[in-house]
Structures are given as structure tokens and as C-alpha cells.
Curated annotation (Swiss-Prot):
It holds the Pfam family Toxin_35. The keyword Hydrolase does not apply. Disulfide bonds join 44-59, 51-68, 58-86, 70-84. Expressed by the venom gland. This is U1-lycotoxin-Ls1x. One of its GO terms (cellular component) is extracellular region.
Length: 107
């Protein structure tokens, strides 16, 4: 019984977190353009593809929207450039693992 309560608590936390984060992802300009329907929907950027020029354009994964994760690359001459790719953050990976494990046990 305790395992069921823990899994239910995790699922409620994940759902509330994902819904609040989805709201945070929309910037004011994006929200206005969605409301006014000014621009057609742009194609999203798939997982592991570069998102340096469009950091809010990543596609959705199984449960969560992919996040644009950036890193600084230092060339041999010392020049630093920022490179970004769409990926699953570690806390989303953990949540997907818990949900997948819960499905195997209870579903």
C-alpha cells in the first residue's frame, strides 16, 4: 500500500510540475502571437538537433517538452562559442524512468 501512495504522490508532483513548466515556456510575445494567430506554427526541433538559434523551438518528448541545453565549446585557438541541442534534462529522465517503472509494476 505504501508503494502505491509513493507512486501516486510522484505522479501528482510530475503532472503539476510539467503543467507549470509548460506555462513558463511561453514568453509574452509567443503568447500574444498564439492568441492573435498571427504566424503559422513553426516546425519543432527534434531531440539531439541543434537549437542554438531557436532555444524555445524543441519538440515534445514522451511526457515532457525537450529543453535546449547549451554548452560552451573552446576551440584550440581559445575562441569560445556556445552550442545548444534539444535534449531531456536529468530530472525529466528520472520522472520518465519512474513512470515507466510504475507502468511495468501496475499496468
Amino acid at each position: 500500500m505504501m508503494k502505491v501512495l509513493v507512486v501516486v504522490a510522484l505522479l501528482v508532483t510530475l503532472i503539476s510540475y510539467s503543467s507549470s513548466e509548460g506555462i513558463d515556456d511561453l514568453e509574452a510575445d509567443e503568447l500574444l502571437s498564439l492568441m492573435a494567430n498571427e504566424h503559422p506554427r513553426k516546425e519543432c526541433i527534434p531531440k539531439h538537433h541543434e537549437c542554438t538559434s531557436n532555444k524555445h523551438g524543441c519538440c515534445r518528448g514522451n511526457f515532457f517538452k525537450y529543453k535546449c541545453q547549451c554548452t560552451t565549446v573552446v576551440a584550440q585557438d581559445g575562441e569560445q562559442t556556445e552550442r545548444c541541442f534539444c535534449g531531456t534534462p536529468p530530472h525529466h529522465k528520472a520522472a520518465e524512468l519512474v513512470v515507466g517503472f510504475g507502468k511495468k509494476i501496475f499496468g
